[in-house]
Amino acid sequence: MMIAVIPARGGSKRLPKKNILPFAGSPLICHTIALARSLPAIDRVCVSTDDDETARIAREAGAEIVVRPPELATDRSTTASAVGHALLKLAESGPRADVVITLQPNCPLRTAAIVTDAIDLYRREKPDSVMSVTKSQHKLGPIENGRFLPAYRPGMRSQEMPEQYFENGVVYVARADMVTATEDLFGRAIAPLIIDPLYALGDIDTLLDFQVAEFLFTKYVERFVLPTGLAAKGAA
């Protein structure tokens, strides 16, 4: 049993109601729901939320709803705790999940092929989890006592830099029993799914992020699964 959980807390501070803002013609969350429902490998699609309006829109889009308790919907609550709670609640109305796919609704630049590749990688390598990552193009380092400390040799060309990757938030696949037992989405053995930098640009936290993601989604719309029916009407 493979379940997709879409964690959608209602209390975003930087971009209020971001999960249900109109995005390319439909509420943002509906794009993730439509994608998850389009994949034959996924048996159930669930939205975990503490927000009534988000729940209504997600239900109309075809997702099951797990009402998230207030203690799991604070600024300090982890995604893993919400996903673990959702899995336990879903087990009350059906078979326990073997695998959970976590799809964050604020990452709409996600193709069916990316999620399918993540599932295939999980099945093939049998890690604790799969995490989508993207190669970093930046020269990074911390600032301590008002001074920048480069984590590389100053003057080093980009092509000389050791390869490093960052977590992009597009897709996570994990053993469901691990998530419910430990509230950990990753475990020790994390298999990386390397994806194109384009798709990593869709991690929405601010209005600028939203505008950039919507521009790219519209430009490359043929790559994505589009919501239909009631969900699309809800954006009007």
Write out the residue ranges for each language-model feature:
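N-terminal glycine-rich phosphate-binding loop and ensuing alpha1 helix
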Residues: 2-48
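Histidine-centered beta-alpha loop that forms part of the nucleotide-sugar donor binding/catalytic region
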Residues: 9, 70, 104, 134-135
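Short, high-confidence coil segments that cap the C-terminus of an alpha-helix
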Residues: 42, 95-97, 126-127, 220
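Short beta-strand scaffold positions
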Residues: 47-49, 173, 204
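Short phosphate-binding loop-to-helix
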Residues: 52-101, 110-113, 117
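Conserved core of the sugar-phosphate nucleotidyltransferase
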Residues: 81, 85, 99, 108-196
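Hydrophobic helical membrane-anchoring modules
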Residues: 194, 199-236
